[in-house]
Amino acid sequence: MTEPTHRGRAGVAVDAVTVGTRAGAPREDTGAPPPSPEGAGAHAIVTSGLTKRFRGGQVAVDAVDLAVPRGSVFGFLGPNGSGKTTTIRMLLGLVAPTSGTWSLLGTPMPAGLARALPRVGAVVEGPAFYPYLSGEANLRRLDAADPGADARTARARIGAALERVGLTAAAGKRYRNYSLGMRQRLAIAAALLVPRELLVLDEPTNGLDPQGTREVRTLIRRIAEDGTTVFVSSHLLSEVEQMCTHVGVMRTGRLVAQGPIAALRASGEEPRLRVETPDAGAAAAVLARAGLGDVRVADGEVTAVAGARAPEEICALLVGEGVAVRGFGVERPTLEEIFVGLTGEGFDVGA
């Protein structure tokens, strides 16, 4: 039978990066109070202190304060086992939290599940359909089981959903003959049989080949362009970087940072100047006298933190002091380096 799908609406942009505590540390004030679910109408998803402890004392999700902006594509990024799926299951009412509060589309949970979920579409832990039925027939059965769906418009809505995910030509094909990418797109179509304001996807590109990954990534962008807020979990850094506007970073159950991707980039280490020269000692002395910070010499290269000085000004200064400059550039930390610094471990970076 098909993966249960749940329905919902969206939230205000988080304009700055919020960096939380490292895993295992006490919960601390990060400079702003956690968002209040009662005042969460500007966000698609808001959590405050959301925690899940399993029997035996294992803490799967630890005091997560999450704020997903309305209209964003929010990447929920973290290594496997960091608590992403457990968080999603709590958001959708599939697992009860141990403590904390949350809201969907401005509606406090869990009391408002019946009101909020019809506006939320979700695909959690992979799609499941009848293999011997066609894609269209599977959607018909799903739609008929939805008490909120209008049977009079079923044919038109199913056709529109198939067209939206690019499966119109394969509508009559048996599900067992679908590629992995087609199966994932059919699951998204099932979640969008009626208009949704929030779409929650758990690892939607997991196990897909590069072509299937591109298909799903393109589809998510199109859905977001239509005004739906998309909350997508992933352990693939490249996926989050290519399709998301905002990101939350999980590590061993804790949310260690969240905000716009551009702001996260800016929150990394300061850019470093790199000078390739046969006169490394002289170049280092010039940079130090000019007030640049953290001057280092290694393997015929000199690096330093420029601060407010313009790179072209520094290059001209070196040349004016008689330093032979063979190469000059500015190195900024990659998104991968920033996230590894936040989590203390790496991410899969392949497509």
Mark where each language-model region is.
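C-terminal coupling/interaction segments
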Residues: 2-20, 24, 306-351
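Short, flexible helix/strand-to-coil boundary loops that buttress conserved ligand/catalytic motifs
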Residues: 143, 265-268, 342
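ABC transporter nucleotide-binding domains
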Residues: 42-47, 52-251
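Primarily ABC-family ATPase nucleotide-binding module
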Residues: 34-43
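ABC transporter nucleotide-binding domain
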Residues: 217-305
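Compositionally biased, low-complexity flexible segments
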Residues: 22-26, 30-34
